[in-house]
């Protein structure tokens, strides 16, 4: 097993409602935005994740990855309350998180970006692309958490997090598990084959859980975000996420994992029918976090989107 790529360095970026932490992978001496030599990209993690979820894909898409096609200036943020970013009052709703992403793009001042989102981040990016189209050059969604009322076994406890008091009690029971047990349970859920995770990455995840356990606000953020996601799943009418998807006019790449235990890969069909300019792919032998489990395949599909190539055949799942 090859040595893992170190996490990218980062800095706090001040926005109107507070600071967020942003990690950057860019070629030395490159500039982004109008007149720059590296197209800007922004990456948004999922529920319980952080900017480090994009480490390998950022490596491949920046010049450091030496991949084919133009190099990207890659910025991955920690949503408020996750990673290194502190929570804010309105930060846990999908619309609030979308506003944070839009504010970051504007603060960077680099023009429309290639926008990437995984899981909850995929829902957030869909809303950004629908409501702020001038900020989005292309949209790449990996297992986006779009409304699907068929509850999967891995997410059966999710609605329970929304029940007053019970949600907090449920999370307190999870927190009684050792950090190592929590990391192992997460890997078993989000990967098709967890053996691909390097021991150093596991050690880093354990250390991060230990750090966040000392912060105090983690469980409350998770409960508030869970309630926001469930509310979006139940929303109907012009402001629903699927209506947002139908309004997206930028070229879109939507990637599902054939063995995703959280987002049903059969949602690929609805995504293909709903997004106007969609390249929809189901990656075989892949779980919920394709950018972590199969970053080279994700990078290749993104390059195909830029080149206008046809996607690979979608396998039957």
PLM features: what roles do these ranges have?
Residues 8-11, 15-30, 35, 55-62, ...:
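Active-site loop/oxyanion-hole signature of alpha/beta-hydrolase fold enzymes
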Residues 38, 46-50, 119:
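Active-site glycine-rich loops that stabilize anionic/oxyanionic intermediates
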Residues 44-46, 256:
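The conserved beta1-alpha1 loop
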Residues 130, 137-173, 177:
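Flexible "cap/lid" loop of the alpha/beta hydrolase fold
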Residues 175-244:
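Conserved alpha/beta-hydrolase catalytic His-Asp/Glu region
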Residues 233-235, 259-263:
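Acidic catalytic loop of the alpha/beta-hydrolase fold
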Residues 248, 254-256, 260:
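Short beta-strand/loop motif that positions the catalytic acidic residue
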Residues 269, 274-317:
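Catalytic active-site module of serine/aspartate enzymes centered on a nucleophile-bearing elbow/loop
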């Amino acid at each position: 097993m090859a040595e893992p790529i170190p996490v990218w360095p980062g800095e706090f970026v001040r926005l109107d409602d507070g600071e967020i932490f942003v990690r950057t992978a860019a070629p030395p001496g490159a500039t982004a935005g109008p007149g720059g030599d590296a197209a800007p990209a922004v990456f948004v993690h999922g529920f319980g994740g952080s900017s480090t979820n994009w480490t390998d894909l950022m490596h491949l898409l920046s010049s450091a990855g030496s991949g084919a096609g133009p190099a990207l200036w890659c910025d991955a943020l920690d949503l408020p309350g996750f990673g290194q970013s502190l929570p804010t009052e309105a930060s846990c709703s999908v619309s609030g998180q979308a506003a944070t992403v839009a504010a970051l793009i504007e603060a960077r001042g680099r023009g429309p970006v290639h926008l990437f989102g995984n899981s909850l981040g995929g829902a957030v990016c869909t809303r950004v692309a629908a409501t702020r189209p001038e900020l989005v050059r292309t949209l790449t969604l990996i297992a986006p958490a779009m409304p699907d009322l068929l509850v999967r076994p891995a997410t059966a406890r999710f609605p329970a997090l929304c029940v007053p008091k019970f949600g907090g009690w449920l999370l307190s029971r999870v927190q009684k598990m050792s950090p190592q047990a929590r990391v192992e349970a997460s890997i078993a859920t989000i990967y098709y084959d967890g053996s691909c995770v390097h021991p150093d990455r596991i050690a880093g995840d354990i250390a991060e859980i230990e750090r966040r356990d000392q912060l105090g606000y983690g469980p409350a953020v998770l409960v508030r975000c869970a309630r926001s996601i469930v509310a979006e799943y139940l929303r109907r009418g012009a402001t629903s996420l699927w209506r947002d998807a139908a309004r997206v006019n930028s070229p879109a790449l939507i990637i599902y994992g054939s063995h995703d235990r959280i987002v049903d890969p059969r949602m690929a069909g609805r995504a293909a029918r709903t997004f106007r300019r969609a390249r929809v792919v189901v990656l075989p032998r892949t779980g919920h976090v394709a950018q972590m489990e199969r970053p080279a395949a994700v990078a290749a599909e993104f390059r195909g989107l830029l080149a206008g190539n046809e996607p690979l055949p979608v396998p039957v799942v």
